[in-house]
Amino acid sequence: MDPNKFREKEISKKEALELFEDNEIIFELFKFADSLRREEVGDIVTYVVNRNINFTNICVGNCRFCAFRANENDKHAYFLDIDEIAKRAVEAKKFGCTEVCIQGGLHPKIDTYYQAEILKAVHEATKPYGDIHIHAFSPMEVYFGAENAGLDIKEALKILKENGLNSMPGTAAEILDDDIRAELCPNKIKTKEWIYIIKEAHKLGIPTTATMMYGHIEEYKHWVNHLFIIKEIQEETNGFTEFVPLSFMHKYAPIYKEGKAKAGATGIEDLKVFAVSRIIFKGLIKNIQASWVKLGKKMVQVALRCGANDVGGTLIEESISRSAGAEHGVYMSVEEIRDMIKRVGLIPKERTTLYKILE
């Protein structure tokens, strides 16, 4: 199949599946995705200066890919109080961050009102320094908080927005297929609940990212269905700011240790995800992020020539990928990020969470 035909023609699910399965045309595919990237966003590659605040690892969930969670009485369990979260946000602001990404495990005492207190405290603490964008709470956290507070999803999202939620990570998507989810994350929200929460957030004017975690127990057909669900949501709401493929970190994941999951995706599969998603999301989601935490510097540089146009954040403290066995560090300086981009002939630019260029 010649990928170039998708310059004019919309790709079907069947054709997307063929592109994932065909190893004879990978270089044509990557070259075509790179040309689409150039048409949509030019040669600018963006990054955000941000800090991740994972405020607790205590979690009642039982996701079988997660090596981050702890029970309340585990030795390594921790829970940052609201003052500590606010203090870290102020440190981030003083450091030059424009965003804090706040997420945590599903701690039994957390509800929507507690999440709202976190938002309020962070905005109040950072206001004297010019305030900070809060990117927080996955659809799973929103669902869990609402349930604990006895609220419906709409009410919960309204409260979070009123208290300063600026945008949401579209994590907890993993693979949007209930058979896969039953095996991978049995306690997590179902596909239709994830879709509903994302759409409600978009309707309220809360932009979100979209993600896909791949390389574990799923097949290519699941990737295709997942990507088309995201495409259909974007056609309806236009609320996704970016798509972030998340390559499965297998090393310490329980499901891998039990011998039930692959050892992550191959390098070629990683690159195919960038390329095919660039084709599927043509004209809909123009920002596709290659995560250096998951892929490492060199692989990100290749991804930037296969459809990706963003490298994510400086991410001071990325404890979730680290506990899963990511080997690429938890912080990259702005100088390193810019150098990584420049060395593949592209132009680095700092952006905000919502993709406003800052230079």
From Swiss-Prot:
Catalyzes the radical-mediated synthesis of 5-amino-5-(4-hydroxybenzyl)-6-(D-ribitylimino)-5,6-dihydrouracil from 5-amino-6-(D-ribitylamino)uracil and L-tyrosine. [4Fe-4S] cluster binds at residues 59, 63, 66. Consists of two subunits, CofG and CofH. Binds 1 [4Fe-4S] cluster. The cluster is coordinated with 3 cysteines and an exchangeable S-adenosyl-L-methionine. SUPFAM superfamilies: Radical SAM enzymes (SSF102114). Its EC number is 2.5.1.147. InterPro entries: Aldolase_TIM, CofH/MnqC-like_C, CofH_family, Elp3/MiaA/NifB-like_rSAM, F420, FO_synthase_su2, rSAM. Signal peptide: none annotated. This is 5-amino-6-(D-ribitylamino)uracil--L-tyrosine 4-hydroxyphenyl transferase. Pathway: Cofactor biosynthesis; coenzyme F0 biosynthesis. Belongs to the radical SAM superfamily. CofH family. Residues 45-278 form the Radical SAM core domain. It comes from Methanocaldococcus jannaschii (strain ATCC 43067 / DSM 2661 / JAL-1 / JCM 10045 / NBRC 100440) (Methanococcus jannaschii). It is an enzyme of class 2 (transferase). One of its GO terms (molecular function) is 7,8-didemethyl-8-hydroxy-5-deazariboflavin synthase activity. Keywords: 4Fe-4S, Iron, Iron-sulfur, Metal-binding, S-adenosyl-L-methionine, Transferase. PROSITE patterns: RADICAL_SAM. Gene3D superfamilies: Aldolase class I. It catalyses: 5-amino-6-(D-ribitylamino)uracil + L-tyrosine + S-adenosyl-L-methionine = 5-amino-5-(4-hydroxybenzyl)-6-(D-ribitylimino)-5,6-dihydrouracil + 2-iminoacetate + 5'-deoxyadenosine + L-methionine + H(+). Its cofactor is [4Fe-4S] cluster.
